[in-house]
Structure formats: structure tokens, C-alpha cells
């Protein structure tokens, strides 16, 4: 995201709460493991990107209350499938062929989709032997959930333009000034609604 200090330069901004997105995955994991020890490997986004910083922060804040959950390795996968796969391969090799890993948390779905491939190639079952949690809600993550290979994703709404255009139309119509900041909803999706969400994405042109 772009940080503009002079707020007079824009009418409104529509954005997601990236810290909350990370927190929702952390909260889900706490419930999922129910007090059992869980070693997490983290696939970070692009180094220095505010989205990556915030998603890391939110997850870390959530699991701070759960001493049974530890991040044992964390490295940038640069928000790509290929890099996510490559880094996950190194995590698996470093952690007893993945046997020491309970969950992979990725700052976006693409990296976790790459990680899923690495997990399978190591002879493990993604979604079972190694849990997955990620952010964005892209169609392929719902496909992975349907296949039993992914566990949780927080949707980054694809409709950010909607509220922005609504604000612009109101301003043009009667001069109504919108709020400076509109935060879109962050929703955690699990396999039980994956088919439904995938159909919605198809209808939106994904």
C-alpha cells in the first residue's frame, strides 16, 4: 500500500486490515491445535512490503497468547508460487523431512499453493500432515480446500473498487464527502464453504 502523509491529496482510501488478516489465521490455528505443540514455518511476502509486515505482525500477536505454538522458521517467498515452493522445500529439508512442521503460514495464497506442491513431493499430505493457512481467497486456494490440501484462507476482498466508486458517485451527485478511510471486511474461509466460494469467484470472472 501507499502511505500518503498529506491527506488533502486524496478524497478517500479503501483498504484491508492486513494485521487483522494475519490475526484471523493465528486465532484459527489456536483453536485447531487445541493446546497441542505446533511448530509453524512462515512464508513472508516481499521484504519491506507493508502488507507482509502487517500480516506477520497480526499472526505473531495472535499466537503470542499460545505458548504451544512457535514460529521455527520464517523467510520471504516473495508472494510467488515458485518461490513459495522453493522456500518450503528448504524448510522441509531442514526440519526432519517436514516431520517437525505442524503448519505453514503464508502471507498470500500463491505461496502456500507452491508450498503444497513441495509438501506433496516430500511424501507428506498437505492439509493433514502439515496444516496450511494463508491470505487472499484466490480461486485455486478453494480448489485446494476441496481436494483436502488446504485448511484456511482469509479473503482479501476483490471488490475494493466498489466502495471507492460509490463514494465518488455520491460526491458528484450532492457533494457528500466520504470518510477518509474505509476498511473492507476480512473473512476467514474454511473447506466447508470452499465449493460455494469457488462458484462465487467464477461468477466474478476469476
What are the roles of these predicted feature ranges?
Residues 28-36, 62-66, 87-95, 118-122, ...:
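Structured segments of extracytoplasmic/periplasmic soluble domains
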Residues 3-6, 20, 35, 46-50, ...:
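Solvent-exposed loop/turn segments at secondary-structure junctions
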Residues 21-25, 50-69, 83-88, 114-118:
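Short, solvent-exposed amphipathic alpha-helices that sit
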Residues 39-42, 63-81:
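Short beta-strand elements in bilobed, periplasmic/extracellular small-molecule ligand-binding domains
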Residues 1, 13-15, 39-44, 72-74, ...:
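Structural recognition of the beta-strand scaffold that forms the well-ordered cores
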Amino acid at each position: 500500500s501507499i502511505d500518503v502523509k498529506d491527506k488533502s491529496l486524496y478524497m478517500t482510501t479503501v483498504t484491508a486490515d492486513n494485521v487483522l488478516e494475519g490475526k484471523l489465521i493465528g486465532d484459527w490455528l489456536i483453536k485447531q491445535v487445541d493446546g497441542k505443540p505446533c511448530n509453524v514455518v512462515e512464508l513472508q511476502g516481499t521484504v519491506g512490503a507493508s502488507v507482509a509486515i502487517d500480516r506477520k505482525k497480526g499472526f505473531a500477536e495472535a499466537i503470542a497468547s499460545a505458548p504451544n505454538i512457535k514460529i521455527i522458521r520464517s523467510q520471504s517467498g516473495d508472494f510467488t508460487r515458485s518461490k513459495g515452493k522453493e522456500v518450503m522445500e528448504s524448510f522441509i529439508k531442514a526440519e526432519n523431512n517436514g516431520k517437525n512442521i505442524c503448519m505453514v503460514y503464508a502471507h498470500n495464497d500463491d505461496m502456500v499453493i507452491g508450498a503444497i506442491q513441495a509438501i506433496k513431493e516430500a511424501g507428506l499430505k498437505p492439509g493433514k500432515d502439515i496444516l496450511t493457512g494463508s491470505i487472499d481467497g484466490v480461486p485455486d486456494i478453494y480448489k485446494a480446500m476441496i481436494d483436502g490440501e488446504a485448511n484456511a484462507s482469509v479473503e482479501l476482498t476483490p471488490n475494493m473498487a466498489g466502495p471507492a466508486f460509490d463514494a465518488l458517485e455520491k460526491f458528484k451527485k450532492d457533494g457528500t464527502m466520504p470518510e477518509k478511510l474505509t476498511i473492507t471486511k476480512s473473512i476467514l474461509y474454511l473447506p466447508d464453504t470452499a465449493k460455494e466460494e469457488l462458484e462465487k469467484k467464477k461468477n466474478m470472472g476469476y
